[in-house]
């Protein structure tokens, strides 16, 4: 390669686009990783508080909080307001994430829902059978719903800590299975454990949801209106005797998601430019409206509610419900209690068994038409970590059991959480001991993902660096004036050095509304390409992003010993404009709005653009091709999935 990049440049591991607009799943997982620690700390505090001063603990959560309007009054204790009020927002976040996966993620191809759906059902039926085997014929058999759920937040957090790095497919699979559990649990909570059911109130709630659908179909986008309807639905469901947390899940599932359109982003940029020239309250409102319109309601609501749900609501729920006096009598009773043993074995043994057996049967009976997006070691790991029922299990337990049986169930849930975490650590520890190629296959599998790149790579048309017939292709949509493309360039160079059997493709996406010289720089690259020097010009342009005026471009052409008259003529006639416009159209088809955007074997790469993240994506792609990622040397173990090496810090 020609052209040198400035040395010593520090760069963020994530572009502004990635950190602000896209990759909700990665942001979701990052939040859950941190919130898992807060949740566990809250559980420890609750246990300590209850054992040091049980009376103050119960007294606080037993206080009554009432809402009264005229002759109407809603009165419940604080624990109810946490369990059925604030937890509604937690289930709203879960519903939002499911809907996003349906609209933009793996589940937009509906057949991919089959295996995780059946795996989730298997992970419910086997634990129920184990619990009932311990409690058959006893009054505590009514607590069978306790062992159904997976605590999505804590399970994702534990997987981030205990599982392999850079495996979004693994986390996606866990999220889908866990959400299937949660959906069924919410239905069971509404049907099997209602309190004083009121059909009239349920009909009112159904009418409100129907109104939400009508407004949504008509294109209504007024957020406060949806909020008022959500509150009304919550009150109606609460009066019906059904746990109103179901409202959050339903409202989340009804909130559509879509990728930001480049036209909307350009419109927002135009409005901001007008505001910059003539600041006024009217234009300020216009700018806010434009920015809001560029993002889907799903993205906006996740941004608002997810941190609150993760760092406040779920820990507060644990604080209100985990507190149980652990004394010798309770431990002795729990050691032989059918409730405790049923919960423990259902989660630690039943969950992984149900998920693994169901996945195996679906794959075998469908002749691998329905195959998990991950390998079998990862499926086992998802099964074991799904045994963390914690938050949702406690929620069901408070509805299904009372008195000593409830305390025994809480002990079982706590012990099962520890047991499931330990078995998950063991599974991935054993997987890490496999040889690199087998480890990648065991964790990542060989299932093909959805192709996000709508315009396939054409070696006769595209600008290709590397072997034309390489098994793995990395495509970048870039802008020569975009500073983040310049910051990602060293990682791309290192990637091509580390992996000799990949091809790299550059496609143009000049963001002309914010980068005034991006278009002419792209045309200069095409003019150089007309003389066989596209990549040399590409390297120079990214190395000198602040110097892209026409005179600078002519200087680069002269440095590359190009025919200057031919170069000038190419630029003057704008011969490269059509080619660039075709790349931009392809970007629109693939829902690409920002730069840099990478695709690895047709799948969009989300998140960081440092060498570690890109190498992991390439390694994952090679696992699907059954070929070696490097054809001339042993694999670099630092880059392998499951490596014990620490992550590279952003900016290093």
Curated annotation (Swiss-Prot):
Quickly give the catalysed reaction.
Answer: Na(+)(in) + 2 H(+)(out) = Na(+)(out) + 2 H(+)(in)
Q: Where are the transmembrane segments?
A: 27-47, 78-98, 114-134, 142-162, 173-193, 200-220, 227-247, 312-332, 343-363, 376-396, 411-431
Provide the Thioredoxin domain boundaries. 428-623
| Pfam families, alphabetized | Na_H_antiport_1 (PF06965), Thioredoxin_4 (PF13462)
Q: Where is the composition biased (Basic and acidic residues)?
A: 628-642
Task: Name the species this protein comes from.
Answer: Salinispora arenicola (strain CNS-205)
Q: Which gene encodes it?
A: nhaA1
Example GO CC term: the record gives: plasma membrane
User: Which keywords are on file for this protein?
Assistant: Antiport, Cell membrane, Ion transport, Membrane, Sodium, Sodium transport, Transmembrane, Transmembrane helix, Transport
Name under which the protein is recorded: Na(+)/H(+) antiporter NhaA 1
